[in-house]
């Protein structure tokens, strides 16, 4: 059967830029899936998604004009029950009637268990045109659109008004109606650069015709790559680099159909403003690409992406420079105004900034952060007074003009203003870095003082918000407690502090009775669960479970333990020792009395005496290895007792009739379990 390329295009008004690429990919994938289900393509559909500000399109290769004929077998009642005394039963008659057949047309087939009556027929394949309308409509319905709209007198809804529909199979129009539009082969190109209506001659020529006649680069990926290449080329010419921002590149790609990269500039005096402010206003407000010199310093040149190509782009450049000048003047004004007051003098204003109505203002929060940060700094061997000072000033920039305009700069502006106020560089850096890590993969605070304030900030948030009942559920986590927990855990894996003790310190910083009394234990459990999720990114689940079963309170040696268990798991003896450990734990659960020391005089059989001797020899070796942090050695020592463990379980009845002997054997196993589980619960390996 011959096949041809299928093209579908929805011509719209300007689509939401931040959603464009996602819409294009979803639309294309849904159409391809519909064609696969309808068996209009063989195997997986080969398709290309197109998305530009005014269109969503998909091009699918090797689409059939007609479905292949299908042999259908409808199975009915069992032969044994379908005929009684030579007469068809009601079940058989009903099956034939429902299948639209006569009884004499039925055949007998085997369904894998028994012979059954069946009706076999050939279903003629339906033409593409009879199936495509529903496929497109379903693809439109499945689009991830949070808000839809109506337009004109239409009763149809979509993310933006739709004004044109192309459906081409090869060079032929497939007649369908979607969103109240009849399909055709006409579309529009660039709003200003195109000559008008474009007739798409063939589904395969779409991209080339849109580029040549329409001045539209229809492929989102193609436009993005072209913009990226042009930006990098312009930057190299200026001996600069583009300030990286993938989200901005995606957004700009979604704003233009015919991208043209232009160079522009601004007055040097604006560079006196912290470059983070200038970069943010250029990227966020104007969608420009700032340029950095070889030292990473902002230059007074920038790149912009225009949707127009003209012989003289100077008027476009001047217009953009004029708009940016106003924005940068605002930033300069905010910066100068903020310098009229020190961070310390701003602290009283934090009393009017509500953190949460149940746990007070930011001013009250600062008091808690100071005490927690000082405590952590002492534990880290850092300057507690410096940590307390950094915590005191950490939130002062929230009431500055600059942070009021650009909340993303909180912490960063605090650093700059702290420097201007004469605070030490260590305190200034800690003010900025106390928000780190902000997200998975973000860098950690660089100094112990910064880490102390960062831990204090996240612990106070986690314990306080949890303590008033605002616990994360499902995908709802408005106070980002999961992110706070992740940040705490990553820092504690670097610093050897007791996580439970820190949680208690944070809890004690709140007024007595304000938080739920179960908060410390509940947040500790929450942290343990988040730790498992974090570690499972790099280690198998059973290894993580084995290490965390010991409920470690210090996390700085976790990586070493995980790596040691991973090596142990590869030993030939590992599986048998894990099984033996599980058996030991099950036996210990049956102990009637408190477990204690082994009484050598009650050891009766050679196997238990040998195991006791092996355990005696093992004890100092494992203790020394664990004390030195050499967990791999500690675990590898276990392999030496496998013969004694095997012999013990083969020849000794642990639950002996003599109560004293039974208790002594359980004491021996308890001692062995302590050695086997010194690093991790190896019984969990392989589960």
Swiss-Prot record:
SUPFAM superfamilies: HD-domain/PDEase-like. It is an enzyme of class 6 (ligase). It comes from Neisseria gonorrhoeae (strain ATCC 700825 / FA 1090). It comes from the Bacteria. Belongs to the class-II aminoacyl-tRNA synthetase family. The keyword GTP-binding does not apply. Its EC number is 6.1.1.14. It is found in: Cytoplasm. Its main location: cytoplasm. The lineage of its organism: Bacteria, Pseudomonadati, Pseudomonadota, Betaproteobacteria, Neisseriales. PROSITE patterns: AA_TRNA_LIGASE_II_GLYAB. The gene is glyS. This is Glycine--tRNA ligase beta subunit. It catalyses: tRNA(Gly) + glycine + ATP = glycyl-tRNA(Gly) + AMP + diphosphate.
């Amino acid at each position: 059967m011959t096949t041809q390329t299928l093209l579908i295009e929805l011509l719209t008004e300007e689509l939401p830029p931040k959603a464009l690429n996602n819409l294009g990919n979803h639309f294309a994938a849904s159409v391809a899936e519909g064609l696969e289900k309808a068996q209009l393509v063989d195997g997986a559909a080969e398709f290309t998604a197109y998305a530009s500000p005014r269109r969503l399109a998909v091009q699918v290769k090797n689409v059939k004009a007609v479905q292949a004929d299908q042999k259908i077998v409808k199975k009915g009642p069992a032969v044994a029950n379908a005929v009684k005394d030579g007469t068809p039963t009601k079940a058989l008659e009903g099956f034939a009637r429902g299948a639209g057949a006569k009884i004499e047309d039925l055949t007998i087939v085997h369904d894998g268990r028994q012979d059954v009556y069946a009706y076999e027929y050939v279903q003629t394949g339906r033409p593409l045109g009879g199936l495509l309308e529903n496929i497109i409509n379903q693809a439109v319905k499945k689009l991830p659109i949070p808000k839809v709209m109506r337009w004109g007198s239409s009763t149809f809804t979509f993310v933006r008004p739709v004004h044109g529909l192309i459906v081409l199979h090869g060079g032929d129009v497939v007649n369908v109606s979607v969103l109240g539009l009849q399909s055709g082969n006409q579309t529009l190109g660039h709003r200003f650069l195109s000559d008008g209506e474009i007739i798409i001659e063939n589904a395969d020529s779409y991209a080339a015709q849109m580029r040549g006649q329409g001045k539209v680069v229809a492929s989102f990926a193609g436009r993005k790559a072209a913009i990226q290449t042009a930006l990098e080329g312009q930057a190299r010419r200026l001996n600069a680099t583009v300030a990286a921002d993938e989200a901005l590149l995606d957004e700009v790609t979604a704003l233009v159909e015919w991208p043209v990269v232009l160079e522009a500039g601004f007055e040097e005096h604006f560079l006196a403003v912290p470059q983070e402010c200038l970069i943010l206003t250029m990227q966020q407000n104007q969608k420009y690409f700032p340029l950095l010199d070889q030292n990473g310093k902002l230059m007074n040149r920038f790149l912009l992406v225009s949707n127009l190509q003209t012989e003289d782009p100077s008027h476009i450049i001047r217009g953009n420079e004029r708009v940016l000048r106003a924005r940068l003047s605002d930033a300069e004004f905010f910066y100068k105004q903020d310098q009229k007051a020190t961070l310390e003098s701003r602290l009283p204003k934090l009393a009017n900034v509500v953190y949460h109505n149940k746990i007070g203002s930011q001013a009250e929060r600062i008091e808690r952060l100071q005490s927690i940060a000082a405590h952590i700094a002492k534990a880290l061997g850092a300057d507690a007074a410096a940590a307390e000072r950094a915590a005191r000033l950490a939130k002062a920039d929230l009431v500055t003009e600059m942070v009021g305009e650009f909340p993303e700069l909180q912490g960063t502006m605090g650093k700059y203003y702290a420097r201007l106020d004469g605070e030490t560089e260590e305190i200034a850096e800690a003010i900025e870095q106390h928000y780190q890590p902000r997200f998975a993969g973000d860098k950690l605070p660089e100094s112990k003082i910064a880490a102390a304030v960062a831990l204090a900030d996240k612990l106070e948030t986690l314990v306080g918000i949890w303590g008033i009942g605002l616990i994360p559920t499902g995908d709802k986590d408005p106070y980002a407690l999961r992110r706070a927990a992740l940040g705490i855990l990553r820092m504690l894996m670097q610093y050897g502090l007791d996580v439970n003790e820190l949680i208690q310190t944070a809890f004690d910083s709140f007024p007595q009775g304000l938080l739920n009394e179960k908060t410390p234990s509940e947040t500790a459990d929450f942290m343990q669960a988040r730790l498992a999720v974090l570690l499972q990114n790099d280690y198998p689940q059973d290894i993580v479970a084995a290490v965390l079963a010991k409920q470690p309170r210090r996390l700085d040696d976790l990586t070493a333990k995980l790596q040691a268990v991973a090596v142990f798991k590869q030993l030939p003896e590992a599986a048998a020792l894990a099984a033996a450990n599980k058996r030991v734990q099950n036996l210990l659960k049956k102990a009637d009395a408190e477990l204690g020391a082994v009484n050598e005089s009650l050891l009766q059989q050679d196997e238990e005496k040998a195991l006791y001797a092996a355990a005696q020899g093992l004890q100092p070796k494992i203790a020394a290895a664990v004390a030195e942090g050499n967990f791999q050695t500690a675990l590898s020592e276990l392999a030496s007792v496998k013969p004694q463990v095997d012999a013990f379980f083969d020849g000794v009845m642990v639950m002996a009739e003599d109560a004293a002997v039974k208790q002594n054997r359980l004491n021996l196993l308890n001692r062995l379990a302590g050695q086997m589980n010194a690093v991790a619960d190896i019984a969990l390996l392989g589960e």
